[in-house]
Amino acid sequence: MENQEYYFDVSYQRSEDGPVGMICLPDIGSVMEWMQRNGESINFALLLKMPGNADGLVDREV
């Protein structure tokens, strides 16, 4: 089986009417750390395991 490169795309919203954002993290451990730091202030989060790498993608909140 081929060892494919991947990253985690986490899309989130801080409150029902609040800002939404997206961050790219390299591994599930990083996702867990982010959730532990930010979980209390997140209304929802969507986690996607994406093929490839996150080079050139910018974390943002709008």
Whereabouts are the PLM-identified features?
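Short aromatic-glycine-(Arg/Gly/Cys) micro-motifs in beta-strand/loop hairpins
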Residues: M1-P19
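N-terminal start and proteolytic maturation junction detector
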Residues: Q13-E16, W34, P51
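A short, exposed loop/beta-hairpin motif centered on an aromatic-Gly-Thr core
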Residues: D17-G29
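Generic alpha-helical structural signal
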Residues: E2, V20, V31-M32, L48
